Amino acid sequence: LRLFTFKTALALGVGLTALSGWTSSVRADDAPPVPAIPALPAGPGPATQPPAAPGTAVPAPTQPAAPAAAAAPPNYKLQYNGLIDAYYLFNFANPKDVSAGAGETYYDIRHNSPALSLAEINVFANAAPKHFGYKATFMTGDTADINHADFMGASHGLGEARYKNVQQLYGTYSLSADGAGIDLGKFYTPFGYEVTESNGNYNYSRSTAFNYVPFYNAGARIYTPVPGLPALTATLYLVNGVFNTTTMGVANDSKRLGYMGQLNYTDPKGKFTLISELGLDKQKFYGSGGPDTKVVVNDNNLTYNFNANSLAGLDYVYRQTKPNGGGKETVNAYAVYFRQQLNAKNAVALRFSGAEDKYEGGTVVAPDGTARPYDITATYEIKSTANFLTRVEYRHDHINYNNGANPGFYGGNSIADRSDQNTISLSGVFTFGQ
């Protein structure tokens, strides 16, 4: 579940050690729910275009596409596409345990060991106006394990979701030709600036802010362009869990609906994209069998294009959880991005991301009750062919504690006694299909 505090994040390495015995591959999360997973464009921006509606495009801010010379006719036939994502990461502290490689990141967590992060295939048929369509996303690897893990429920035999290899499975009905429609099933969450598939992001690793929003949801979503404002799309979600664990998001045992909404505005001139989401719920936020917890999560992000080769992005996440019995947690997280396309094949991307994670009662993870993690990340990418992307990335992480009860990052003796972590990674993503 993507409700990571750093105690949970550090538990991830331990959990994956066990999970690695069950699967031989490595994983991912926010694949764009579009009819294809295109490779990164020559110009700046992630691999997906701005969403007209959640049923047809990724619900995350992206670089607006350049005007096309001629639009291709709609394709309503069966289609498929996918990707393979692998990496090698070295932690300069050189921990002995390969699963203790990068305690603050989500997917690139293996140290000094080549790893398959994600193998994914999408099968879909776009919905013609007044007709039905569908999409299924199948995946394996560490990404599938992490997206569907419930570490707090592991002692109850609930360490993984049974259908972890089915990341998305939903039907679509197109209400009109202008992009209105309804989806029913399991789909990626609208929250977050970054997505599961690394080639859809500016950097290979995910930001600190990414740690505080969900991975996926299950239920219904209804979306439509706002009358009189065709650049603005509104979406309403009725789900069985704003956050997801083995039970939440697929069979939420709180027996209550969660409510989410999204507003997505794309500047008609292509200068910026602005997206805001809000989620309200009362669910078993702290794992299977935990207390009922009031949940509020809000995500706001902006992408601004300076020109055809340069862009900046901003992301702000607010999350508050109030479990029955006390122990309120309030999170304010942020990320700042800059991407520069150098030429047709090369680009650089910089990111600074952090959070203030405050506990009032309950578990105290820092001397003053507030965890303040941050990361500084620099990425150089090489797009050698249309369907292969290589990245070299340096990342520095910091947390404001490293005491025995609440450990920090792992050192060379595999003891989590450090406040800082430095890693470098080499990754490759191969895409295929239509």
Where are these regions (language model features)?
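Hydrophobic, lipid-facing positions within transmembrane beta-strands of outer-membrane proteins
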Residues: 114-121, 164-171, 216-220, 257-261, ...
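Outer-membrane beta-barrel "beta-signal"
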Residues: 382-384, 388-392, 416-434
